[in-house]
Amino acid sequence: MIVRTLEEIEDTDADIKTENWRSKRIVLAREKVGFSVHETTLYAGTVNDFWYANHIEAVFVFEGEGEITDKATGETHQLKPGSLYLLNNHDKHQVRPKTDMRTVCVFNPPVTGREVHDENGVYPVIVEDEEEAAS
């Protein structure tokens, strides 16, 4: 059994900070459970273009408000506490938080925590090697 708190993750290598968002990686690929879980805060007034070409992501909003636009169709959905969006088709999307928006994100395949969005907003697939995963 693994039990973690957000406080344990803060200011570690599992706490990723950018100008637009902060993501605390709670469960990562090294746990070998087939998914990763993150608590991510997207900052008010930012514009965030993402495309998870190599991952499926589910995002549950539990605080704040914003909107998401499907970049292929132009369809926009309002996001508020209790909203969930599932990027089941590797959808290119844009998230625009109106207020700081706190979310819980689940990725499959799991991320390692070392991924960086490329110029298209894509995370590469990084596979944990056995030795690294054991540490």
Swiss-Prot record:
Pfam families: Ectoine_synth. The keyword Lyase applies. GO terms for biological process: ectoine biosynthetic process. Its EC number is 4.2.1.108. The keyword Lyase applies. GO terms for molecular function: ectoine synthase activity. Keywords: Lyase. InterPro entries: Ectoine_synth, RmlC-like_jellyroll, RmlC_Cupin_sf. Pathway: Amine and polyamine biosynthesis; ectoine biosynthesis; L-ectoine from L-aspartate 4-semialdehyde: step 3/3. It is an enzyme of class 4 (lyase). It comes from the Bacteria. It catalyses: (2S)-4-acetamido-2-aminobutanoate = L-ectoine + H2O. Belongs to the ectoine synthase family. HAMAP family: Ectoine_synth (MF_01255). PANTHER family: L-ECTOINE SYNTHASE, PTHR39289. Catalyzes the circularization of gamma-N-acetyl-alpha,gamma-diaminobutyric acid (ADABA) to ectoine (1,4,5,6-tetrahydro-2-methyl-4-pyrimidine carboxylic acid), which is an excellent osmoprotectant. This is L-ectoine synthase. It comes from Saccharopolyspora erythraea (strain ATCC 11635 / DSM 40517 / JCM 4748 / NBRC 13426 / NCIMB 8594 / NRRL 2338).
